[in-house]
């Protein structure tokens, strides 16, 4: 019988701190890392690199099925490696974002990427960061964490992040955008953003990131022991 590599899933809304937590867990456990939110952007960039017709589902499916991508947590940073090249910054451009949205609209592309995400499950284990990792992608994961925080706290964190990059931001507008996205994510008909029934729900509103990491790591080690 094949023993599947263990998976720790971390789901939650935008701005809850999933990325930071997952990088820390991957480094602490020395496990593989999957950033599911970046995978559509990686596909979009690969399509642009290979001059694949982004409006053709038939052309995108084989590319999605054989996407050569790795995620590497290094010194608290996430590196996205596409076909051996670091594309961490390139995937964040507006052109790639727009292309990613188009690709995500195709059901067969989503199905191909679902299989591709499951292929990240390799020894010694996988940390999976997303919105439906514990409910759809890895429903049998032994450790499931749902990381949440109030919309106000997430807007505050995002504002500080953007200000740190030199952007002028309006808190009320940010808060409104986050609430709208939450509403959309929680009420969508396919894979809504909800905690898995067996997930540990962590509310990080009043916690420091170090406290979140310590709590999640202790929980994971307890289950995996």
From Swiss-Prot:
Classification via Gene3D superfamilies: P-loop containing nucleotide triphosphate hydrolases (3.40.50.300)
Subcellular location: Cytoplasm
Keyword set, alphabetical order: ATP-binding, Cytoplasm, Kinase, Nucleotide-binding, Transferase
Keyword Transferase: yes
Top enzyme class: transferase
Stored NCBIfam families: cmk
Protein name (record): Cytidylate kinase
């Amino acid at each position: 019988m094949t023993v599947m590599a263990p998976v720790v899933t971390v789901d939650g809304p935008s701005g809850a701190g999933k990325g930071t937590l997952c990088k820390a867990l991957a480094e602490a456990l020395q496990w593989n890392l999957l950033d599911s939110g970046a995978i559509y952007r990686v596909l979009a960039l690969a399509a642009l690199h290979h001059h694949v017709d982004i409006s053709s589902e038939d052309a995108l499916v084989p590319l999605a099925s054989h996407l050569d991508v790795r995620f590497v947590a290094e010194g608290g940073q996430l590196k996205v490696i596409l076909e051996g090249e670091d594309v961490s910054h390139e995937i964040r451009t507006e052109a790639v974002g727009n292309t990613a949205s188009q690709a995500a609209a195709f059901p067969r592309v989503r199905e191909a990427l679902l299989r591709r995400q499951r292929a990240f499950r390799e020894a010694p284990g996988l940390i999976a960061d997303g919105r439906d990792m514990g409910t759809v992608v890895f429903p049998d994961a032994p450790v499931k964490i749902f990381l949440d925080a109030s919309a106000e706290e997430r807007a505050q964190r995002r504002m500080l992040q953007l200000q740190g990059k030199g952007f002028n931001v309006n808190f009320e507008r940010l808060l409104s955008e986050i609430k709208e996205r939450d509403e959309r994510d929680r009420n969508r008909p396919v894979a809504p953003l909800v905690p898995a029934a067996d997930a540990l729900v962590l509310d990080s509103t009043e916690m420091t990131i170090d406290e979140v990491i310590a709590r999640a790591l202790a929980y994971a080690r307890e289950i995996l022991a």
